[in-house]
């Protein structure tokens, strides 16, 4: 299941390389990222993160990404290609060029950002396509209180790197993560910084 890049029959294709019809940026505006001739899209720094128009609960998400190579010798740590995929706009799996690029362990590629380090660094070199297959079990809230936490299982290039780990709350760079009650919400791809990276072949399956 995790090694076939073609979406299964019950998948919702979020990006097929032709347009941004399933995405918006801040203010429900058209994304200003670039669609390339090879069917990928590239982040344009400063143009804002993008969000799916549809909201989701628990899902299986497939996404492919490629770290950029421009001026790579001048960048290290978190200043290489750096982004993130956020489930329900709150819970981040880090996207980072972590190939021969040391950084803090819970901020490397495949980390549940600032919460769980990956079991292994499965990164390929910049310029090579990589894949994440993410199983996201959404948190459950009742009367605005947490009834059941969320969980992540993640495969990076087909290798298990997060094994049903508990999500402690909304991703935060500083301080302790906390939950705030919410319902289904969009998937977000982050416009963060540094060397632009690309995405392709994004699809999702609802698990509830």
Regions found by a protein language model. Give the residues of each.
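Carbohydrate-interacting regions of secretory-pathway proteins
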Residues: 1-208
């Amino acid at each position: 299941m995790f090694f076939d890049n073609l979406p299964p029959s019950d998948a919702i294709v979020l990006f097929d390389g032709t347009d941004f019809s399933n995405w918006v940026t801040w203010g429900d505006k058209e994304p200003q990222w670039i669609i390339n001739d090879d069917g990928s899209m590239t982040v344009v720094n400063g143009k804002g993160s993008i969000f799916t128009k549809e909201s989701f609960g628990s899902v299986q998400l497939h996404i492919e990404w490629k770290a950029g190579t421009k001026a790579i010798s001048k960048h290290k740590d978190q200043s290489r290609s750096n982004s993130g995929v956020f489930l329900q706009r709150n819970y981040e799996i880090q996207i980072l060029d972590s190939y021969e690029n040391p950084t803090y362990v819970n901020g490397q590629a495949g980390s549940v950002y600032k919460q769980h380090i990956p079991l292994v660094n499965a990164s390929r070199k910049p310029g090579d396509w990589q894949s994440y297959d993410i199983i996201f079990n959404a948190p459950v809230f009742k009367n605005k209180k947490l009834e059941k936490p969320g969980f992540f299982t993640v495969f990076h290039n087909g290798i298990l790197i997060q094994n049903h780990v508990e999500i402690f709350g909304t991703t935060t760079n500083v301080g302790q993560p906390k939950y705030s009650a919410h319902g289904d919400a969009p998937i977000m791809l982050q416009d963060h910084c540094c060397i632009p990276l690309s995405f392709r072949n994004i699809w999702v399956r609802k698990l509830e």
